Amino acid sequence: MADGEDIQPLVCDNGTGMVKAGFAGDDAPRAVFPSIVGRPRHTGVMVGMGQKDAYVGDEAQSKRGILTLKYPIEHGIVSNWDDMEKIWHHTFYNELRVAPEEHPVLLTEAPLNPKANREKMTQIMFETFNTPAMYVAIQAVLSLYASGRTTGIVLDSGDGVSHTVPIYEGYALPHAILRLDLAGRDLTDHLMKILTERGYSFTTTAEREIVRDVKEKLSYIALDFEQEMETSKTSSSVEKSYELPDGQVITIGAERFRCPEVLFQPSMIGMEAAGIHETTYNSIMKCDVDIRKDLYGKIVLSGGSTMFPGIADRMSKEITALAPSSMKIKVVAPPERKYSVWIGGSILASLSTFQQMWIAKAEYDESGPSIVHRKCF
């Protein structure tokens, strides 16, 4: 073990939509694949194909015609542990090609993750994968670290869930964390619906992937939604064309900004919830009056659903309208924010000061899964 290369910690960020995994110290994850487990619908159908009982990630995606697909993480929280174990197994052995018993593992968790879940993660790492050490960190806190700060409020919006997490000197303030069950998957659904209204048919899972691509490539957030709607009626400046895999070209105009507008107006999809701007404001208001100034001045965006062009300006405009007029508002949208949770994990796990923070196997053997609450907070 003298060779430092051997004991490089592993960092695994398990999202609702994508798993991001790699080695501490790297500046980007080596493996990014869908959080899906597929099981054959009919056993014995693929005779002689060396059929596996389960497929994970891209392979499950490409064979989906003969599989039943499951997402083991719902709204950011693990709901199916057998499938989750399959995903971790695939991550270590097939994607990173490492032996987990030789590396400390840093895992990420959603804010307000139930205690039993943290214990279960800890147990699986030590008992199934025999890791020498592990740690569980809150996703939004890692995003803040990645932006080079320890105090601020993070709006983390991925595929399955969004959270606003106020953090003071490195610690998340649980009483002020707010969760919004509105994220990338809902935006894709909404865009499918708008395009269907226009006469295009997108219904299957394969077509859903196409719409997700349209969303990622062409959507943007309007600074002023009403005005943008007016502009789109009279001018073709917002129109863009997109070539479908079959060669058909579709034109999308107002849909480009109507789709992500849902983040600011959840009522557009019939949700009774505050938009991301108001949720961020509400989160700040749940914090002690003395630290609000620090939070308003450091609003950090993180996650794939914050990648829309125009989002930072719009957030800034909306929060300025809600906050006290003398307050200085700063919204930070780091270019690498799609992976900033993973990057924060990579930074944290490679700090020399962090080395005494790991839960060692010996400590686990002595105290059991509840050790995670004492060491990871």
Curated annotation (Swiss-Prot):
Q: Which UniProt keywords apply?
A: ATP-binding, Cytoplasm, Cytoskeleton, Hydrolase, Nucleotide-binding
Catalytic activity, as annotated: ATP + H2O = ADP + phosphate + H(+)
One GO cellular component from the entry?
Answer: cytoplasm
Asked if the record carries the keyword Coiled coil, the reply is no
List localization entries. Answer: Cytoplasm, Cytoskeleton
Which PROSITE patterns does the record associate with it? ACTINS_1, ACTINS_2, ACTINS_ACT_LIKE
Organism's domain of life? Answer: Eukaryota
Any single GO molecular-function term of the entry would be:
hydrolase activity
Q: What does this protein do?
A: Actins are highly conserved proteins that are involved in various types of cell motility and are ubiquitously expressed in all eukaryotic cells. Essential component of cell cytoskeleton; plays an important role in cytoplasmic streaming, cell shape determination, cell division, organelle movement and extension growth.
Instruction: Quote additional remarks.
Output: There are at least 7 different actin genes in tobacco.
List the protein's name: Actin
Species whose genome carries this gene: Nicotiana tabacum
